[in-house]
Amino acid sequence: MKRFLCGVLAALMLVVLCACGKQETATVRLSEVTHSVFYAPQYVALEQGFFADEGLNIELTNGGGADKVMTAVLTGQADIGLAGPEACIYVYNQGKDDYPVVFGQLTKRDGSFLVGREDVPFSWELLRGKTVIGGRAGGVPEMTLEYVMRQNGVVPGTDATVDTTVQFNMMAGAFTGGNGDFVTLFEPTATEVAQAGKGYILASIGQESGEIPYTAYFASQAYISDHADIVQRFTNAIARAQKWIAEHDAAQTAEIIAPQFPDMSVPVLTQVVQRYKDIDAWNATPVMTRSSLERLETVMETAGVLDHADWVDFDRLVDNSYAHNAS
């Protein structure tokens, strides 16, 4: 009898220990700037269960632009935002105390492609005297486009017109509707326009721009402070996905993320993933470097939206501790 009771007690203790060791599931409301193959590592983390392994339930919404993602984070409608870190710079320079802080980087160059109306050998000189639908003024896509144009001797506003009046998620529709001569589009939209016979992919903006912290994860300081464990678990999942995508080819990646893009065939999705692999779009780890942030601020200064005196110190805007712990 005594031996039986000891066995029962041991079993109960094992159950209690297992229950104590089990991680509580937490829900994270994540607002992404757009739903694009450009963010493939994030979808790998979702589809491979990397977030679930960290005890996280992700509620993903499409913010439809960096400004809208930032608004969602600032108003508490989203816990974490995925957008260009320029949004954090703008908020910091507005003097807000609880300005959002970047804790992880996903992409390291522009993920948009220049789409034109004719299938011709591309030269930036083709833009002279033409109109390019470039996105919202002050957004990283528009600023990077202008930076690349200047780098190639085409001055926006003088040699070519950059239309900044069209909302980010309306750019493809505006172009296929007859506006502009060129447009910058992310995947899968660029390929969808090309497949519809409404345009031709001519150039990669990111290949021309060099490395910048194009898309990153950020949250309010209050959220990070109150939910440090969740932020670490989130970053762990992203780091694991970045490693996974580096070790697998485009076809394998396309198979995994296909549920996120139900309107695309796997062969076309494979082609799109390969296009991003070819331009080295994704970070190897979530760590952001000081030099890359400074290049972004250079792009912003060149675009006329940031004075040099208003550059934000790296250590104020970026907390790499979670990324280092995850990598």
Please identify what each model-predicted range represents.
Residues M1-T27, N325-S327:
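Short, low-complexity disordered leader/linker segments with a strong preference
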Residues A26-Q167, A174, D181-E187, K198, ...:
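Short, glycine-/small- and polar/acidic-enriched structural segments
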Residues S36, N93-Y99, A137, V155-D159, ...:
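Short, charged helix-to-loop "capping" segments that act as catalytic/coupling loops
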Residues V44, F50, V148, E192, ...:
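Residues within well-ordered alpha helices
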Residues A78-G81, T176, Y276-R290, S321-S327:
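Short amphipathic alpha-helical segments at helix boundaries and their inter-helical linkers
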Residues A87, Q167-F261:
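Pocket-lining segment of extracytoplasmic ligand-binding domains
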Residues S225-D307:
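Secondary-structure end/capping motifs
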Residues E297-S327:
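Conserved C-terminal helix/tail region of periplasmic/extracytoplasmic solute-binding proteins
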